[in-house]
């Protein structure tokens, strides 16, 4: 049983957290005790809870630019006595820099460093530090990476390019459909940059179709095609990036989840 702290209104989402397809993917691919789960976009620790519930002995390394969310996640780790956890109060990008995180609420899960994706949408800003993964954590053995950064996927992946090539982890990554007509071309261009980078790393792309917290189906694709946002978009905006040398094993395990609808 996980203890959920409430701090200045934060914590409710963790209290109502339900099992979903990501839990099953973690069970299949991330239970490697001598390697690390990298969580890019910790927010208030939703994936931290999922991971530590399933893999209590495996190391966890999280990155989160929102200082309020980091303070909450540290408290979550403390009250539950989660072992082997490090949270870096920084964004991941292509290098060390000072960036602006736009948000509306203190723990806004939609907060983004890419302001052009949601023009004039956010009400608040926070100056944050960014760093590239490779410079600081290249030697760290990775088994699995989760990326949820509201548009900053390319910078995250580019900044950990050498680590991805060396350690060959699986990557679950959200790539959102275009939230406004005016930014559809911009959003597609950024998604295409991600695809080109993955291709250069010898990685394949699988689009996941999820519904009601379950994995319904999946499709091996060459390109991520961005559409205008609809109510169905959340069911098709999650992807699995994987080394092509592991393709047969990855496809076989994913098929087992679809068969069981986990």
How should these model regions be labeled?
Residues 42, 92-94, 133, 149, ...:
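Hydrophobic pocket-lining residues within nucleotide cofactor-binding pockets
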Residues 88-90, 203-212:
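Conserved S-adenosyl-L-methionine
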Residues 130, 188-201:
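Short alpha-helix
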Residues 1-132, 138, ...:
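S-adenosyl-L-methionine
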């Amino acid at each position: 049983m996980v203890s959920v702290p409430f701090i200045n209104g934060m914590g409710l989402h963790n209290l109502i957290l339900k099992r979903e397809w990501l839990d099953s993917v973690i069970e299949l691919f991330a239970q490697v005790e001598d390697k690390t789960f990298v969580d890019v976009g910790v927010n208030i620790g939703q994936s931290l809870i999922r991971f530590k519930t399933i893999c209590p002995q495996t190391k966890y390394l999280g990155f989160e630019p929102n200082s309020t969310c980091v303070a909450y996640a540290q408290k979550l780790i403390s009250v539950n006595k989660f072992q082997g956890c490090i949270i870096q109060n920084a964004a991941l990008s292509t290098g060390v820099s000072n960036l602006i995180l736009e948000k509306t609420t203190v723990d806004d899960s939609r907060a983004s460093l890419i302001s052009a994706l949601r023009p004039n949408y956010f009400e608040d800003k926070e100056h944050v530090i960014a760093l590239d993964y490779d410079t600081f954590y290249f030697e760290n053995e990775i088994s699995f990476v989760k990326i949820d950064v509201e548009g900053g996927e390319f910078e995250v992946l580019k900044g950990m390019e050498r680590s991805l090539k060396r350690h060959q982890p699986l990557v679950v990554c959200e790539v959102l459909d275009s939230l406004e007509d005016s930014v559809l071309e911009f959003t597609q261009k950024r998604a295409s940059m991600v695809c080109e980078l993955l291709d250069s790393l010898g990685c394949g792309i699988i689009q996941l179709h999820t519904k009601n917290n379950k994995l319904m189906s999946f499709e091996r694709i060459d390109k991520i095609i961005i559409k205008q946002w609809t109510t169905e978009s959340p069911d098709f905006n999650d992807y699995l990036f994987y080394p092509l040398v592991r393709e047969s094993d990855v496809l076989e395990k994913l098929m087992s989840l679809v068969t069981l609808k986990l």
